[in-house]
């Protein structure tokens, strides 16, 4: 069993991400210093793979991620425990950023980490009912829809967007893999 005492790290992450957004608004060049871009590798600025997770490009971007982290993060943290939740969050987020930096000029946001949470929940709680696109559906169906939308977006079906679909797809793939690796240890 993967559980350990719940310390509500998902709620602390919500607070930290929100505070970082306030700093982005108040401090000129704050975002530029922590943003993930090509210089992260060429200039040995490896902290950017982590710090970019806490940055957001707009209030809408922030609110979508906070909403998803609140609902999915709390559920996963209760299922696998706080320490394991943090491992999934940071492992998915950093690895998704390592992949995304090869496709985008710059990248920011917690989406890769959150999609990792979603991916793991898809494996360990596939029939959990979630509300998305105005409907209630099983988690695995919602994930198929989200994956399909991101694949189509990556292929340009929706025109040019600022959405990091590669980070989304990488995060959910990592979360699904982690879910299969550890699902035998998760209490059902």
Pin down the residues of each PLM region.
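A detector for small-residue-rich transmembrane helices and their helix-helix packing motifs
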Residues: 1-188
């Amino acid at each position: 069993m993967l559980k350990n005492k719940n310390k509500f790290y998902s709620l602390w992450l919500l607070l930290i991400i929100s505070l970082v957004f306030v700093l982005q608004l108040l401090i000129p060049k704050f975002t530029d210093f922590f943003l993930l871009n090509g210089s992260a590798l060429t200039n040995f600025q490896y902290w950017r793979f982590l710090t970019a997770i806490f940055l957001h490009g707009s209030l809408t971007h922030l609110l979508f991620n906070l909403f998803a982290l609140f609902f999915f993060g709390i559920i996963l943290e209760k299922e696998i425990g706080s320490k394991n939740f943090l491992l999934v969050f940071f492992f998915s987020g950093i690895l998704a950023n390592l992949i995304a930096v090869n496709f985008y000029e710059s990248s920011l946001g917690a989406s890769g980490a959150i999609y990792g949470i979603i991916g793991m929940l898809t494996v360990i709680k596939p029939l959990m009912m979630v509300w998305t696109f105005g409907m209630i559906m099983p988690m695995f169906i919602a994930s198929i829809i989200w994956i399909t939308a991101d694949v189509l977006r990556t292929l340009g079906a929706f025109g040019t967007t600022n959405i990091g679909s590669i980070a989304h797809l990488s995060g959910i793939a990592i979360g699904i893999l982690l879910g299969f690796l550890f699902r035998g240890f998760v209490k059902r």
